Amino acid sequence: MEGKAIATSLGGDRVLIFPCSPRSSFVFTSRLSSLPLKRASIGGAVSCSGVNGLTRWNSIVSTRRLVPVRSINSESDSDSDFPHENQQGNPGLGKFKEYQEWDSWTAKFSGGANIPFLMLQLPQIILNTQNLLAGNNTALSAVPWLGMLTGLLGNLSLLSYFAKKREKEAAVVQTLGVVSTHIVLAQLTMAEAMPIQYFVATSAVVTIGLIVNCLYYFGKLSKTVWQLWEDVITIGGLSVLPQIMWSTFVPLVPNSILPGTTAFGIAVAAIIMARTGKLSEKGVRFVGSLSGWTATLMFMWMPVSQMWTNFLNPDNIKGLSSITMLLSMMGNGLMIPRALFIRDLMWLTGSLWATLFYGYGNILCLYLVNCTSQSFFVAATIGLISWIGLALWRDAVAYGHNSPFRSLKELVFGP
C-alpha cells in the first residue's frame, strides 16, 4: 500500500511531514493494547512477523491497534505461510462496535478452553500420583505412553503455529497441553511404564520447544533459528502422522514402520527443496503450512481411532466417561468462534472435527449402548447445536453480513 504524506508548516521555510495511510483504509480503535499486533488483522495488514507497515512509519501510533475497514491485498499476504491467513471479512463502520466486541469475546472463549482441558488431564495426574505413592506402579501401565507422546508432539506443533499467528489465548491452551502431558509422561517413567531414554529425549524437545516459542512470541529470536525449528516440527509431524494412521488398523494390516520412514524421507526432501530454492513460492508456502496441518490431523485422527476401537470391541465403550467426552466437546467447541472469526480454516477444521466426532460422537455412542441417560444426550445435543448457531450468527453480525453462510464462504474461498 502506498503511503501519503501530510505536510504541516512550522513557519519560515521549515515543513514537518507526517506519513500516513490512505484515509479510507484504516480506522484507529480506542482500545489500547500492550501487544497491538498479537492477532491477525483483516485484509492482511499484519504480517506473520507481527510488524505493521503504519507503525514502522510513525512510532507515535504504535500502541494503538489498526483495523482495516476494507480488504487490501498487501504484500504481507503473499508472505504468509498459512492458507487463508489474514483473509477476514470487512466490517463496515456501522458494525465496527459489534466487530470489536465479538473480537474480544472470541478471544475470551478461546482462553476459557483451558478450563475443560485442564479438568480432562488433572484427574489422571492425581490418580497417577496416588498410585505412585501407594506403590501400585502396575496401574500406570494402563496409560498408553505412545499415545500421550503423540498428543504432546501435536500440542507442541500447534503451539508454534499459534505463536507465529500471535494468537495468545490459543497458544496458552497448547502450552497447557504440553506441560500437563509431560507431567503424565514423567509419572509413567517413574513407574517404569515408559523407557527412560525416550522420556529424556522428549524432555529435551519439550524444553527447547517452549523456550523457542516463548522467545519468538516476544520477538527475541532470529528468523534463522525459528525457521530451523519449523523444519524440525514439520519433519517430525509428517513422519509420525502416517505411522499413527497405519498402526490404528493393526492387526488387520502388517505391523510395519514403513509408513513412518517413507514419510520421513519425503519430509526431509521437501524441506531441502524449499530451503534451496527448488520449489515455487506457492510450494514453499505449502511446506511451511505442513507442520500445523499435520498436528491438526493427528488430533483429528484420535476420534477415528476411538470409533474404530468401539466398532471392533463394543464392550470397551463402557470404559469411556460421558463427563470426559463432554469436557472434550466443550474445550474444542469454545475455540470454534475464534477460529471462524479470524478465518483460520485449519484451526476451525480441527476444532469442529474434534467437537463433533470425538466429543459428541462418543457421547452418541455411549447413548446408543445405554451408558448415559437420555436427558444428558439431549442436553449435549441442544447445547452443541445452539453454540455453533450462535457462533455463526454473531460472526455474521460482527462482519455486517446478511447470512451466516457468507462467513463460511469467506473462510474457504477468501473475501
UniProtKB/Swiss-Prot annotation:
The keyword Heme does not apply. Expressed in leaves and roots. Expressed in root cap cells. The chain crosses the membrane at residues 139-159, 176-196, 199-219, 231-251, 252-272, 286-306, 322-342, 345-365, 373-393. Keywords: Chloroplast, Maltose metabolism, Membrane, Plastid, Plastid inner membrane, Transit peptide, Transmembrane, Transmembrane helix, Transport. One of its GO terms (cellular component) is chloroplast envelope. GO terms for molecular function: maltose transmembrane transporter activity. Probable maltose transporter. Essential for the conversion of starch to sucrose in leaves at night, probably via the export of maltose from the chloroplast. Required for root cap cells formation. It is a multi-pass membrane protein. GO terms for biological process: carbohydrate metabolic process; maltose metabolic process; response to nematode; starch catabolic process. Residues 74-93 are annotated as: Disordered. The keyword Membrane applies. It comes from Arabidopsis thaliana (Mouse-ear cress). The gene is MEX1. This is Maltose excess protein 1, chloroplastic. It is found in: Plastid, Chloroplast inner membrane. InterPro entries: MEX1/MEX1-like (IPR034628).
